[in-house]
Amino acid sequence: MAARDLVFQPGDRVRTSGRFVSGPDGDWLDLQRVHDLTIKPPGWKSDLSIRLIGADAAAVPSEFGPNQVPGHITVVGRWHAPAPGEQVRLGDESIEVETQTPEGPPPRPRADRTHPPCLPPPGGWPQNVVWYEGWPQSAVSDLDLDIRDLESSGAMVHRAIFRPSEDQEVLVVAATDVEAVTRGLSPSLPNQLCVVRSRFTRAQLDEVRDVLHAHFHEWRLEVFGTGSSDSQGQPFATAEPVRVTPELAAWDDTLPKGLLLLSPTITPPEIQHPDRQAGG
């Protein structure tokens, strides 16, 4: 699926999930996914809220259930917004609700980190974890190595801890210079290190980060970063826009496949799980 498949225009049908808010100024769906710990007054909504037309306040769930969070709903309906290029203010965008279900936002995808992408050493990965007051401790999780040279040179692109079992920890490193990283880390992590050749360089990830930062407000990004990796330990960048605009999609299509994962809050209705690897 290409990024352009996530683009929609005024009048198109869309799907989204969020927190239902009702007040004197009407019904809203607050799409904010990243929250701080401050207590908000009743009826508060973020600047990522969309006006709802025809929502059923009585059908909003008040209790937890399977894939159900109090106050949260999923809607499908017609998208209304100013023409492209016009300034968007709170309340200018709305969804004319066709269907409403008591479903919360879909969970963020999480990579499986139980199977390191390297063959285990003879005898298997060591039982190297000691639990202390409910927290795992090992040479991997307590890593105290000077890796600044490996990171600054670009030899080490990303590192993550894999846990084949609760008593095992393996450091998985995606590297552009496998030999240098192996030579630098293996003496301190015998039989606890897995180094794979990175699909992307640190420079590629940094360039994506810089572009996302420069267009943060224009593309209405809620959060972005370059610290993620998949089940093979391969790094990628992430971005969570409210929606994928034509401009964001055009830039995304220039990227190598797998370099960026887009997770828009609002999508065309046929797309159930918008998390996808970009550049395709």
Name every feature range the model reports, one short phrase each.
Residues 1-235, 240-280:
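OB-fold and OB-like single-stranded nucleic-acid-recognition modules
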